[in-house]
């Protein structure tokens, strides 16, 4: 693939997931959209790291750190969602006021 195609793909993925995050009413779907946003950013890190300086792996290493942080965020987010589901029996964002108290 040429360099122009990959950032367009990443921007397309990013914009779809931003739309999904804004319009999502389910907490699990919002977490999935957030993970895909981070993956779109990782695609750009790896692409530009490979294109501009293929000898140094700064973009690749940074994307590995982002993946590790995203995994921790997913674990914490899913724990919060399961706790809210146990208490409220719903994963809808607009029905959950548990964290406001």
From Swiss-Prot:
It is found in: Plastid, Chloroplast thylakoid membrane. InterPro entries: NADH_UbQ_OxRdtase_chain4L/K, NUOK/Mnh_C1-like. NDH shuttles electrons from NAD(P)H:plastoquinone, via FMN and iron-sulfur (Fe-S) centers, to quinones in the photosynthetic chain and possibly in a chloroplast respiratory chain. The immediate electron acceptor for the enzyme in this species is believed to be plastoquinone. Couples the redox reaction to proton translocation, and thus conserves the redox energy in a proton gradient. It is an enzyme of class 7 (translocase). One of its GO terms (biological process) is ATP synthesis coupled electron transport. It is a multi-pass membrane protein. Belongs to the complex I subunit 4L family. It catalyses: a plastoquinone + NADH + (n+1) H(+)(in) = a plastoquinol + NAD(+) + n H(+)(out); a plastoquinone + NADPH + (n+1) H(+)(in) = a plastoquinol + NADP(+) + n H(+)(out). GO terms for cellular component: chloroplast thylakoid membrane; NADH dehydrogenase complex. This is NAD(P)H-quinone oxidoreductase subunit 4L, chloroplastic. The chain crosses the membrane at residues 2-22, 32-52, 61-81. Its EC number is 7.1.1.-. The keyword Cytoplasm does not apply. Keywords: Chloroplast, Membrane, NAD, NADP, Plastid, Plastoquinone, Quinone, Thylakoid, Translocase, Transmembrane, Transmembrane helix, Transport. One of its GO terms (molecular function) is quinone binding. The keyword Transcription does not apply. NDH is composed of at least 16 different subunits, 5 of which are encoded in the nucleus.
